Amino acid sequence: GLPYRGARLLEAAMAKGQMKASAENQQLLAQLWEGAREWPKAVDSWQLLAKQHAQPKAAMRVAELLLQQGKTEAAMTQLVAMKSTKGEQGNRAKALLVQAHLNKEQYAQALELARELQQHDNWQQRATSWVNYIQAQTDGVNKKAA
């Protein structure tokens, strides 16, 4: 498809020095690989953008794609490093970590992060639904054990 061809052309042009490997071009390349559903190449491109151009949003996108691809451990490594970031970026990392912990049925860790997110207005509703879900899950586990 078009995204795949676009990504191949852009990647080749950047490799040959015909186009600058600028942050904008690197981001476009990552987006094209995503559009082509070439997940490993998309992850690599976002990772490169995050490292070379110090872009936290790119690092966040890497974590999202890793989670989407079922690579929970790799995503968690990325997110743990980002969760202490101030503001919305840190909260987004915590939210993704909640999801990762839920994927692994690590309810205590998920609950702790969800409760932290409840303190922030724009995350309160989602975090509360996570807390309710986690409590329902752990109640079910406790009843089965009894």
Where are these regions (language model features)?
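TPR/TPR-like (Sel1-like) alpha-helical repeat modules
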Residues: 51, 102-125, 132-135
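Solenoid-like repeat scaffolds
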Residues: 11-20, 46-55, 80-88, 115-123
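Generic helix N-cap/helix-start motif at coil->alpha-helix transitions
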Residues: 2, 20-27, 52-61, 88-95, ...
